Amino acid sequence: MQSITEHKGCRASAKTGRASCGSQAGRGDLPVEIWERVKNHPCYSEDAHHHYARMHVAVAPACNIQCNYCNRKYDCANESRPGVVSEKLTPEQAVRKVIAVATTIPQMTVLGIAGPGDALANPAKTFKTLALVTEAAPDIKLCLSTNGLALPDYVDTIVRAKVDHVTITINMVDPEIGAKIYPWIFFNHKRYTGIEAARILTNRQLQGLEMLSERGILCKINSVMIPNINDDHLVEVNKAVTSRGAFLHNIMPLISVPEHGTAFGLNGQRGPTAQELKTLQDACEGKINMMRHCRQCRADAVGLLGEDRSAEFTNDQVMKMDVHYDLEMRKAYQKRVENERVSKVAAGQKELAGVSGEMSAITVLVAVATKGSGLINEHFGHAKEFQLYELSTSGAKFVGLRRVEGYCQAGYGEEDRLSVIMRDIRDCHAVFVAKIGGCPKSGLIKAGIEPVDQFAYEYIEKSTIAWFRAYVGKVKRGEIQHVQRGVPPRWPGDRISAA
C-alpha cells in the first residue's frame, strides 16, 4: 500500500488550483485504489453521503483529555452532538448491533468508533469490537476517531486491525492557543495542564498523523472553529496537516449552548456564523479538500448523515431481533446504488454541457431540501436542513449546510418560524423543494428568494444546473439583473451546521 502523499490524487490540480482528493473528488479525480476505498464512505466522499449510511458504536467511554467544548453524556437521547450516547455497549453487544443495522440498512457501509470518550483511551474494547466486526461482517469499512494523544502507540495495531480510515481532532499547532482549549491531558500516568499539556498533545497528534500517512491510512482531520481563539490559527493547522499527508480537513463550528454543560457553553463563548465558517473553509481549500457535509454526529449515530435511526436499534430492541447477515443481498443493493450514481452523474454532465461558455462570471448560491439519494425530495415545511450548492458554468458545487427549525409543526406553520428560515438562507437566490405551501412561497418571493418546485424528485445537480441555465438566459436577455446576494452582519442567534 502506497503512502497517501505519493498519490497524485492528493495534490492540487494545475488547472483549477484545487485539490483533486478529498470529499468532493469523483471517480476520475483519484487513483483507482483510493477511489475504491472512499466511493461508498459517506464522510470521505461528499457524493457518497447522499446514498450510503454509517453507524457508530459506543464502546469507548473513557477519555484522556478534557476539551472546553465537550461534555460527555452516557444516557442522553435529546442532544445531537459528539460525546453523547443513549447507552454504552460491550464489544459483544456492539457487533450484534452492527449485524442488526447492516441487515436492516443494506447501504450501511461504515462502522466507526467515536466515543463517547476516545477510541484509543479504551484500546481493549475498541480493538476487540473491530476484530469481532471484521469476522462477522467483512465487507464493512472500519473507522475510528481519536484526539491523537495515544495515537503513536497504536498505529501498528490500527494497521493490523484493518482500519482504513482514521479521524484525528486537531484544533491547534500552537501550545499557547491549545492551553485555551484543553484544561488538561492525562499522559504516561500523569496529568498535565496549560501550555505543557498542549505541547505534548500537538506533538503526539502530528507524529501520529505522519505515521498513519506513511502506512497508507486515509486520515481526516477534524478541527473545531472557536471564534477569537483558534479561528485565524486554523489556517496554520491546515498547512501543518496537509504537509503531513492528511486526506481531508473538516472544519466544524463550535457547538456552544449552556444546556450542554460545556465550559465554553457556560462561559458564553459563541460559535461562528455561517459566513465566518465558509470564509475559513474557502481559505483552507486548495492543496487539500474541505469536508463540508459533516453533521457532527452523536457517538451512537445510525443511518444516513443528517438522519438518526439509533432509536430503532437500542440494545433491548436488537436483542429481540432475529438477524442474519446476508452479504449477497447487501452487495446487490449497493450495486443498484452505484448504477443510480452513474445515472445521476451522466444527467448532470449532459445538462452542464448546455451551460458551457455562458457568462462565466456569474455564480449563485441555492438551497436544496433533500432526504437523500441525491434527489430534491423533501417538503419545504418538513426540512430540518438545507444543502447549499454554488452554481456556475463549472457545475453545481456542494458548499455547506444550514440547519433550520421545521416550518410545519403538527400540521401548521408559523410566520415567525418562516422569518427565521428566510434569515438562515438569506444569501441564496433560490430554494429547491419537492413541495411548498402558498404562504411560505409568497414569503420567500417577497424576500427575493425564488421557491423552485418544478424539479420535485429529480437529481439535484441536473435540476440546479437546468435552473441556472435558465437564470443565465434571463440575464443575457435583460429580463432580470444579476445581483450577488450578500450576507449582512451577524444576526443574534444565527445558527449554522458543520459544512
From Swiss-Prot:
<keyword id="KW-0535">Nitrogen fixation</keyword>
<feature type="binding site">
    <location>
        <position position="297"/>
    </location>
    <ligand>
        <name>[4Fe-4S] cluster 2</name>
    </ligand>
</feature>
<keyword id="KW-0004">4Fe-4S</keyword>
<feature type="domain" description="Radical SAM core">
    <location>
        <begin position="49"/>
        <end position="298"/>
    </location>
</feature>
<feature type="binding site">
    <location>
        <position position="69"/>
    </location>
    <ligand>
        <name>S-adenosyl-L-methionine</name>
    </ligand>
</feature>
<feature type="binding site">
    <location>
        <position position="294"/>
    </location>
    <ligand>
        <name>[4Fe-4S] cluster 2</name>
    </ligand>
</feature>
<feature type="binding site">
    <location>
        <position position="169"/>
    </location>
    <ligand>
        <name>S-adenosyl-L-methionine</name>
    </ligand>
</feature>
<dbReference type="InterPro" id="IPR034165">
    <property type="entry name" value="NifB_C"/>
</dbReference>
<dbReference type="GO" id="GO:0046872">
    <property type="term" value="F:metal ion binding"/>
</dbReference>
<dbReference type="GO" id="GO:0051539">
    <property type="term" value="F:4 iron, 4 sulfur cluster binding"/>
</dbReference>
<dbReference type="GO" id="GO:0016829">
    <property type="term" value="F:lyase activity"/>
</dbReference>
<feature type="binding site">
    <location>
        <position position="117"/>
    </location>
    <ligand>
        <name>S-adenosyl-L-methionine</name>
    </ligand>
</feature>
<comment type="similarity">
    <text>Belongs to the radical SAM superfamily. NifB family.</text>
</comment>
<keyword id="KW-0411">Iron-sulfur</keyword>
<dbReference type="Pfam" id="PF04055">
    <property type="entry name" value="Radical_SAM"/>
</dbReference>
<dbReference type="InterPro" id="IPR000385">
    <property type="entry name" value="MoaA_NifB_PqqE_Fe-S-bd_CS"/>
</dbReference>
<feature type="binding site">
    <location>
        <position position="221"/>
    </location>
    <ligand>
        <name>S-adenosyl-L-methionine</name>
    </ligand>
</feature>
<dbReference type="InterPro" id="IPR013785">
    <property type="entry name" value="Aldolase_TIM"/>
</dbReference>
<feature type="binding site">
    <location>
        <position position="70"/>
    </location>
    <ligand>
        <name>[4Fe-4S] cluster 1</name>
    </ligand>
</feature>
<dbReference type="Pfam" id="PF02579">
    <property type="entry name" value="Nitro_FeMo-Co"/>
</dbReference>
<feature type="binding site">
    <location>
        <position position="67"/>
    </location>
    <ligand>
        <name>[4Fe-4S] cluster 1</name>
    </ligand>
</feature>
<protein>
    <recommendedName>
        <fullName>FeMo cofactor biosynthesis protein NifB</fullName>
        <ecNumber>4.-.-.-</ecNumber>
    </recommendedName>
</protein>
<feature type="binding site">
    <location>
        <position position="63"/>
    </location>
    <ligand>
        <name>[4Fe-4S] cluster 1</name>
    </ligand>
</feature>
<dbReference type="InterPro" id="IPR007197">
    <property type="entry name" value="rSAM"/>
</dbReference>
<keyword id="KW-0479">Metal-binding</keyword>
<keyword id="KW-0949">S-adenosyl-L-methionine</keyword>
<keyword id="KW-0408">Iron</keyword>
<dbReference type="GO" id="GO:0009399">
    <property type="term" value="P:nitrogen fixation"/>
</dbReference>
<dbReference type="InterPro" id="IPR005980">
    <property type="entry name" value="Nase_CF_NifB"/>
</dbReference>
<dbReference type="InterPro" id="IPR036105">
    <property type="entry name" value="DiNase_FeMo-co_biosyn_sf"/>
</dbReference>
<comment type="pathway">
    <text>Cofactor biosynthesis; Fe-Mo cofactor biosynthesis.</text>
</comment>
<comment type="function">
    <text>Involved in the biosynthesis of the iron-molybdenum cofactor (FeMo-co or M-cluster) found in the dinitrogenase enzyme of the nitrogenase complex in nitrogen-fixing microorganisms. NifB catalyzes the crucial step of radical SAM-dependent carbide insertion that occurs concomitant with the insertion of a 9th sulfur and the rearrangement/coupling of two [4Fe-4S] clusters into a [8Fe-9S-C] cluster, the precursor to the M-cluster.</text>
</comment>
<dbReference type="InterPro" id="IPR003731">
    <property type="entry name" value="Di-Nase_FeMo-co_biosynth"/>
</dbReference>
<keyword id="KW-0456">Lyase</keyword>
